A protein has these predicted regions:
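RNase H-like (RuvC/DEDD) metal-dependent nuclease/polynucleotide-processing core
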Residues: 1-5, 9-277
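C-terminal recognition-helix end and immediately following basic linker
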Residues: 307-330, 334
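Short intrinsically disordered terminal tails
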Residues: 275, 337-339
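Short linear motifs centered on Gly/Pro in flexible linkers and helix caps
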Residues: 114-116, 284, 308
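Short cysteine-rich clusters marking metal-coordination/redox-active sites
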Residues: 296-299
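Flanking scaffold residues of small Cys/His-coordinated metal-binding clusters
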Residues: 290-291, 314
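Short Lys/Arg-rich cationic patches that frequently serve as NLS/NoLS or arginine-rich RNA/DNA-binding motifs
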Residues: 276-287
Length: 339
């Protein structure tokens, strides 16, 4: 069976690289439940380690080994790999890549991909920062350094299957669900609902319950990896290249007008409690008891007096917004969604 792979390149130290491996059944793009596998995707080494070509080669090799192992165990044939990263540095004679200029025309923001010479200077500057005692979280050009890992990953995987560059932010812009940052509130689930109309998954409550197991990592990274796999699964005639694909300078988007729109059962209703945002800590004098009262985000019937205290007992026995009779399974599902 053919496999379509999406990689949300991650370099954060000790963070699993989000990788979604999908198959198509009756036109539905179904992700493997990789978080349940014994083997897990490699962890990022951190931005400082990513400055080293040797480290990036090792990371990319580990990702390749992981993908091949999963495909072998499931008897899958990798057909296309979509990577959320530039596949190579910008050409020296360009100020911005052609793909980035196309994004500019569509008013979609993105970081400029440095050229090889630019990266040489970035590495020197970053190493000087470290040598002078600078903190890792203040590393200059931190939002571009991850691209070095992306280059290595693309190079390592090019003999596994054709690799294409995608940009999840551009994808959700096209789907008209980019109004809020993906890490805020329930935005990742809103984006996944929009995707599901074209992938056919998830379409039932049971499938929504499987979302946490697509791969390791935060929900928004899982959704990015799955959306990448979706574009990898499309025929080339159903994809639009922003830039010049012949020059390996293209970001691919779906051509929605070419695609079947699935009728999916939207049983899952996203709520703001699924992905809580960080809030400033308050002193006891600034906090009143009313701020702790909360309507259950699953059943919308039970009122917690001091959220989230008591969630486990409620989820295990009384909550009508969680399916199933197994107590531990009910608590796990509730915790994955709302805590």
């Amino acid at each position: 069976m053919d496999a379509y792979i999406g990689i949300d390149v991650a370099c954060k130290k000790d963070k699993y690289c989000p990788i979604s491996i999908c198959v198509k059944k009756d036109g539905i793009l179904i992700p493997l439940q990789l978080a349940n596998e014994r083997a897990q995707s490699p962890k990022g080494l951190g931005n400082i380690a990513t400055l080293s070509e040797v480290n990036n080669l090792a990371y990319a090799t580990a990702i390749k080994k992981y993908i091949l192992a999963i495909c072998k165990s499931h008897q899958l044939n990798p057909v296309c790999i979509a990577i959320d990263s530039p596949l190579q540095p910008r050409a020296e004679h360009l100020k911005r890549r052609r793909a980035e200029l196309e994004l500019d025309k569509r008013k979609i923001s993105c970081y400029t991909t440095p050229s090889k010479a630019d990266f040489d200077n970035i590495i020197v500057k970053a190493n000087r920062h470290i040598a002078s005692g600078g903190k890792a979280n203040k590393l200059p050009h931190s939002m571009q350094i991850f691209m070095l890992a992306g280059f290595a990953i693309a190079n390592a995987l090019k003999d596994v299957a054709p690799c294409i560059e995608i940009y999840p932010h551009a994808t959700v812009k096209l789907l008209d669900v980019a109004g809020k940052h993906k890490t805020k509130d329930d935005q990742a689930y809103i984006q996944l609902q929009a995707l599901s109309k074209f992938t056919g998954w998830p379409s039932t409550q049971c499938e929504w319950d499987q979302v946490p197991y697509i791969c390791k990592g935060p929900t928004h990274d899982k959704v990015d990896a799955y959306s990448a796999a979706w574009i990898a699964s499309l025929a080339q005639s159903d994809r639009l290249a922003l830039g010049e694909s012949e020059a390996s300078d293209a970001i691919w988007l779906p051509i929605l007008e070419h695609l079947i729109v699935h009728t999916v059962l939207q049983k899952f209703t996203p709520t703001a409690e699924i992905m809580p945002t960080k809030r400033n800590k308050k002193t006891p004098s600034e906090t009143n008891i009313g701020e702790h009262t909360k309507l259950c985000p699953a059943c919308h019937a039970h009122m917690f007096k001091r959220w989230p205290f008591g969630w486990d007992a409620h989820a295990a026995h009384k909550c009508t917004g969680v399916d199933g009779v197994n107590i531990e399974a009910r608590k796990r599902i509730y915790k994955e969604r709302f805590l």
